[in-house]
Amino acid sequence: MSSLLERLHSKYSQNRPWPETIKLVRQIMEKRTGMMSGSHQHLVTCLETLQKALKVSSLSAMTDRLESIARQNGLTSHLSPNGTECYITTDMFYLEVLLDTEGQLCDVKVAHHRENPVSCPELVEQLREKNFEDFSQHLKGLVNLYKVPGDNKLETKMYLALQSLELDLTKMAAIYWQATNATVLEKILHGTVGYLTPRSGGQVMSLKYYVSPYDLFDDGTGASISLSEGHAVPRSLGMNVSVTIEATTSMYKLPIAPLIVGSHAMDNKGTPSFTSITNANSVDLPACFFLKFPQPIPVSRAFIQKIEHCTGIPLIDGSHTFLPHYELVTQFELAKEKDPGPLNHNMRFYASLPGQQHCYFLNKDAPLPDGRSLQGTLLSKIPFQHPSRVPVILSLIRHQVAYNTLIGSCVKRTMLKEDCPGLLQFEVAPLSDSCFSISFQHPVNDSLVCVVMDVQDSTHVSCKLYKGLSDALICTDDFITKVVQRCMSIPVTMRAIRRKAETIQADTPALSLIAETVEDMVKKNLPPASSPGYGMTSALSGLTTPTSSYTSGQNSSLFNMGMKERHDSTGHGDDFNKVTQNPILTSLLQITNNTGGTLGSSPTQPQHTPPPVSSPASNTKNHPMLMNLLKDNPAQDFSNLYGGSPMERQNSSGSPRTELGASATGKPKKKRPRTGAEKMKNQTEDDFQRELFSMDVDSQNTIFDVGMAGDALDTPHITPAPSQCGTPPTVYQQSIPHAQSNMQRMVRIPSTDAIIPDVTDILSDIAEEASKLSGPGEDCPNLGTPVRDSSSSGHSQSTLFDTDVFQVDGGGGSGGENPYPDPVDLIVDSHGSPNSDSPNTFFNSVDFNPDLLNSQSQSGFTDDLNDDSSQSGDNDFKDFAGPGLASLNIVSGLPVDGGDGKYKMGLGADTLDFSIISTGGSKTLGGPDIQETQSRSQSPLLSNDLGKDRPQKQKVKESSNGGGAGGGLSGMQSAGMEGKSMKRSRTPSSDGKSKDKPPKRKKTESDGKSPSHITNRPFTPPTSTGGSKSPGTSGRSQTPPGMATPPIPKITIQIPKGTVSVGKPSSHGQYSSSGSSSSSSSKSHHGHSSLSSSASGKIKSNKSDGSSGMKIGSSGGGMYSGQSGQSSSQSKNSSQSMGKAGSSPITKHGLSSNVSNSSGSKTKPQGKPSVLMNPSLSKPNISPSHSRPSGGSDKMSSPMKPMPGTPPSSKAKSPIGSGGQHLSGGGSNSTTKSSSGLVSSGSLSQKPNSSSSSSSSSSSSSSSSSSSSSSFCGGVSQNLHGNSKGKSPSRNKKPSLTAVIDKLKHGVGTGGPGSEDPMDGGGGGGSTGAPSHGMSSKHGMVVGEFPTKREKSEKDKSKGSGSGGSSDPSKKGGGDSKGSVGTGVAKIIISKHDGGSPSIKAKVTLQKPEGGGDGLRSQMQKNYGSPLISGSTPKHERCSPSHNKSPAYTPQALDSESESGSSSIAEKSYQNSPSSDDGGGSGSRAQTEYSAEKHKKHKKEKKRLKDKDRDREKKKSYGMKPESWSKSPISADPTMAMSGGSMMSSDRGVRPTPSFLMDDDDLMDVPLTL
C-alpha cells in the first residue's frame, strides 16, 4: 500500500501548466455540449408534446403554439409589437395570423410573393377549431410550392406558371358546366377536369375524377352521400389528383399566363379554345406540371403507353420493371384498409353475400392475345406541359380506375373455409387491358358459363354472357350490364346473375325439360335444318354487341330500324319453325291456325285457317303478340318495349348475341311461332318437332326453352316478353288481328302489358335493362325468337347483329349489340367452329348438299345473309351458307332432306335446285338470295316444277314465291319490289295470297314441314325480307316448293307460279325486297310476307320516311342492305335476286341484293359485303327499290290490311322516297337496288325465270322497284328496270289484255306491263314518269296504279293472265304459271287505289301458265316499250356507268342479270333502246304496252316454246349450275325463260349480252345464252 501511494505521489508531484488545464476543461465541455444536443432535441419534442396536450386558451398560449408549428416546418415567426399579430414567414410567402387580446382567432391571411395578403377561410376554420395538425399540413403545402432548387427569381416564375395553369383549369371547369349544366356527379365522371377544388392555403388544387357507386355510401350509416352544388364535396371522396409544379432534370416550356381565350366552349362538350404557346406567354423552366395521386395507383402497361403518347413525356424509364397488374390491384385495395396487414391470399379471395358465398381466383398470369400476361406498375404522378392535356389524361385514368375498381371489388379480407357448403367458385382472368372474363358454373346446367366485361370507359361497361347452345337461359347481357354499371362490383353482379337465373328457372318450369329434350335432339343430330336458323342465331351470339347501356341504346336504335326488318325477315321463320315444330311451344302458343291447328296438323288446315290468319305467318297472326313482335315493332319496340327484353336476351345462347337479341328477344317469339307454322306445313309434325328441338338446341335451349316455357307454361311473361317486345309492330296490324283471333295463347301473349309485367317480375332488373339492350340475340334459337324479333329471328338476329353491327357500326347491334368485339370474335369462331353458338355448328350438322353450300348463289346468299345477319366474318356466313340452304331448305327441306339440298318440291335439280332455291328461291334463306339462285339456276325447275307443284300444292306459294323456290327471288323481289305493284295488281294475287297466305303457309307448313325448312327458317328471316313476318314463311314459300305437294286451297292471283309474287308478303314486304315479299307473300306473308314483311315492313316505315326508307335501306335496310334483319334478308332476297340475277356473285351473296343491296348486287355481285359495304346501294334499295319491291309488297300488303295503308303511304313514298333512295343509291343502283327488287324481279324473271311467276313477280317487283327507283332516280332507272322488269314480267306473265287493262287503269303510269306494271307500269311506269309518283302514292307504284291494275289484273287473272291486276302476282302467276304450271287457281285480290284493304274480286283459274307467261311477256314487252325504259335508263345511267348503254340494258346489268335478263330482255325484245321508250313516259308506256301486247302475244307463243326448251335446258343446267344461273337465266329458270326468256329470245338475247356482260358476267351469260 505504501508503495502504491509512493508511485502516485511521484507521478503527480509536478504541477501541470494552466493552459493545459484550460484546454482539458474545454474538451470536456465540448463533449458535454455534443452530448446535450441530442438531449436538447429530445427535450424539444417533449415540450411540443406537452403543448399539444395543453389547452390553448390564452394569447400567450396561442402565440407559443404558432411559433412551435413554424419551427417544426423550418419557418421563422415573430410577433407584432402589441403581441396580437403573429407572422410566419419565408422568402416567397408569409402568413399573418390576427388574434384578439383573449387569444381568439380573428383572421388568417396568406400573401405570396409580391401579392397582397388574402384571407384563407380554411386556415381560419382550422385555427378556430384548434386543429393545429391540419394547420401544420397547410404550412408544409405552402413550403412545397416553392421547393425548387434555385434562386427566388426561378421560384417566382414557377409560381406564375402554376398560377396560370390553375386559372386555365378553373376556366375549363366553368366552361364545361356552362355547356352541359352538369351535376356534381356528372362533373366528376365526365367533366373535362373533373370536379375542381381550387388551391386554398397550403392545399393545392385538386381534381376529383372518379367516384365509384360504393364511394357514395356512408360506411357508418349506409345512407347515400348527396352531391350537390350547394354542399361542399369532401376532398377525400372518390379518386383525386393534385395539380402541382415540380422541379425536373429536363427543361420544359411552361406557360406563365392563362392560355384559354374567351369564356365559351367550342362544342357542346365544354371544350375551350387555347392560344398557342409563344415566348411571350411561356418560359423554359427546369420544372413541369404534374398530376399527383395521393397514393400510387396501378396502371397497366397499355395505359401508360397511351398517357405517354398523350403528353409526349415518358412516365417511366426503359429499365422499369412491370408486375402483374392484378397483383398491383390487390396491393392497392388491401392498402386501403385502415389496418393494412399481411394477408396470405394467393390471389384467392372470398366474398360473403346475402344467401351466397363466393370465392374469386384472380388469374394474374393469364396470357393475353399477345402471349404476355397483363402487366402494370404503380404510378404516383403524371407530368404534362399544357392544360389541354388534362382532360385526355383524366379520361385515361378514369378508364383505368374503373377497370381496377371492378377487379378490386373481388379483393376482400373475408376468410371462408374451402369446404364451405354452397361456395361458388369464380375465376377472373384478363383478356386485355380493359376487358376481362369471369368464368363460373352454369346455375342450372353442368356446364361452364363465361361473362365478358369490357370496360369501354369509366361509365360504360359492356357485358356479354357466353354459354352453351343447349344451356338454360341465365339472364340477358343488358341485365348484367345494368347491374355492373350500378354497383361496379363483380361479387354483387355474380349474385344478381345467379338470382336472376333462379328466378327464370322458377318461372319456366318446363325449361329444364325442354332443355333435356333439345339436348337429346342435338345429340341425335336430328334436324340440322334448324341449325341454319340457329346458325344465324349463333352468328348473332357470335356477334359482339355491347349490352352496356350505351350499347344497348345503340342496338335498340339499330333494332328499331334494322331489327324490325330483320325480325320480319329472319326472326319469323326461325321462331315460327321452333314454335310449330315444338308441340309444347305450339300448345303453349296455341298455334293451331297457322300451324294447321297443331304442329302436326295437316297443311290444308293452316290453309283453311288462313282467312283468320291471312298469311303464311298465320300462326303469328293468330298470335297477336307474336304478330306484333314479328312485325314492325319488333325492331322499334323490341328493345324499348321490353325492359324485360333482357330476359329474352338471357335466352340467347351466346351472351354475345344476347345484346342484340334483347331487342330481338321480344319479337322473336312471334316470329318463332310463325316459323314453326310454316315449317309445320312443309314437314310432318314429328319432323317439325325434331327440327324445332334441334333448332332450339342449336341456337340455344334457352331461347327455345324460354319461348316454350313462356308461351306454354307459367313463363308466358317470358315468352310474352319476346312477344311484348314485338307487340308494337305497326306494320303488322293486320297480322296482329289475325293472330289475335287465331291464337288464344297469343291473345294472352298479345296482352303485351300482361306479359310485360310478368316478365318484369321475373326479370325486374332485366326488364329495366331490356330497354337498353341492344338486342342480345345470342340465344337466338329460343329467345332467339324474341331475339329474332328484335333481330328478326334467329337468322334475323344474326342478320340483325350483322346489321346492327353494320348499322351501329353502321346499331345495332346491335345491341349493338355493337359493337362488341368479343361477341364478334365469338361469331367468327362460331362460324368457324361448329361448337360455337353461331349457326356454324348447326350448319355443319345440317345435312346440306355440298353443292348447296358451295353453290354460288346459295353460298353467296348464305354469306350475304350471314353477313347481314351476323357480324361474324365471311366464314360465319359461309357456315351459314349451308344453313342458308338449310333455311332454303324451307324450299328444299335441307335439314329434312339434309345432305341433298334438294328442293323438296321437286325442284329440277334437287341439289342444284336446292342450292338455287336456297339462294334464289328460299325465302327462309334470304328470299332474294335463295330466290335468286333459284330464279337463276333453279328457277326454271322451281318455276316449272314448283309452279306446277304449287298449283298442286304449296307450290303456289313457291310460285308465288317466284316461280317456286326458283321464283323465290323473283317472288321475293317481285313481292317486295313487285310487292307494291303486286299490292295493287298483285293484290288479288296478294290478297288471295294473303288470305291464302295462311293456307299457303299452312301449305308450306304441310309441304315444307321438313325440318330443314323449319331449320332453315332462320335463314328464312334473312329471306324474310320479303315476308317480314315469317322469314320462315318466306323461306317456306321457297320451302314449300321444295316440300310443297299439297295444292294451296287459295291462290292469290297465285297462278301456281304467278303466285310467286305474293300480295301478302308484298303487304309486308312492300319495302323489303318485293321478291322476298312475293315469294314470302303468298306463303310466308302473314300480312307481311316473311321477307317482304320484314323488308317491306321495315321498308314501309322506311319508305314512309322516304329518306327514312333509304336510311333503313342503308341503315335499317342498309344494315343488311336495308331492312335490318329482315329487310336485310329481304333486301338480300331482293338484292340478291337482283344482284344475283344481275350478278351471279350478288345473287350468290344475296347480300348484294338487298334492295338496298341492289347496288351491292350490281356493284358487289358478291353482295354480302356489297350490301353491307354499299349503304348507298342499300339506301336506294330501300327507298326506291324497296319502295318498289315494297310496292309489290304493298300490293300484297294491300291484302294485308297493315300493308295497304302503311305500304301505300310508304309506297307513296316509295316512288319518290324510294326512288330517291334508289336514286341516291344510284340510278344504276336503283336498277340494281331498286333492282334489288327490280333486278331481283327482273333478274329473277330473266335469269331463273324464277319460274315465270318468280320472274314476272320479280319483274313486277323489279319494275315496281325500278319504277320507284326510276322515278326517284329520274325515272330512268326505275323505268328502265320497271320497263325492263316490267316488260319482262309483263311480257312474261301478263296477258296483253291484262297489260292493256293495267295500262288503262294505271294509265301510262301503269307502265302497261301487267304484272310488272304495278311496279313497272303502275309503279314502274308511274314511277318512271309521273307514274313514279303514282307508284309512290299507290303503294309505291302498286297502290295507286294497282287499284286499276288490280281490277284489270283480276280480270286478266280470271282470264288466266293473272298478271293484269296484280301485275306481279298476275304476271308471276301468269308467267310463272306458264313456266311452272299448266294451270292454277288464282285468287284475285284487288286493293283499293288508296291502298285500302284489298278485296278478293274473284278466284280465277289461271289459264295456261305459259300463256300467262307469254301474256306477261307481251306486257313486259309493252313495258319495255313503255316509258319505264326511258325512266329506267336515265336512272341506270345515273346510277352507274354500266347503265349508260341503255336504260334497259343498264338496269339489266345493274339489276343483276336477273333484271337485266328479265327486264333487259324484255326491253331488248320490246325496246331495243330502253332509254328511247322510257322517255315516252306513262303515256308512251301505255302505248308501248299496247303494241307490246300484240308483240307479246306473238312472242308468248315463241316464248312458250322457248320456255319449254329453256325449262328443259334449265332442268339440265339446273342441277349443273346453281351458282352460274347467270349463264342461262332461261335455262336456270323456266319462268325466267318464259318471262325473261321469251323476251330474251325475242331479240333480247343478243342485246342483253353487252349490258349483262358489263355488269354481271354470269347474269350476262344468261341473257346471252337466251
From Swiss-Prot:
It is found in: Nucleus. One of its GO terms (cellular component) is mediator complex. One of its GO terms (biological process) is cellular response to thyroid hormone stimulus. Keywords: Activator, Nucleus, Transcription, Transcription regulation. A motif (LXXLL motif 1) lies at residues 585-589. A motif (LXXLL motif 2) lies at residues 626-630. Residues 961-970, 1217-1228, 1308-1328 have a biased composition (Gly residues). InterPro entries: Mediator_complex_subunit_1, Mediator_Med1. Residues 788-801, 832-861, 931-942, 1173-1190, 1276-1287, 1418-1433, 1441-1455 have a biased composition (Polar residues). It holds the Pfam family Med1. The keyword Transcription applies. Residues 1494-1503 have a biased composition (Basic residues). Residues 592-687, 771-880, 922-1561 are annotated as: Disordered. It comes from the Eukaryota. Residues 1022-1035, 1066-1082, 1089-1113, 1121-1140, 1152-1161, 1229-1271, 1459-1469, 1536-1546 have a biased composition (Low complexity). Component of the Mediator complex. Belongs to the Mediator complex subunit 1 family. This is Mediator of RNA polymerase II transcription subunit 1. The lineage of its organism: Eukaryota, Metazoa, Chordata, Craniata, Vertebrata.
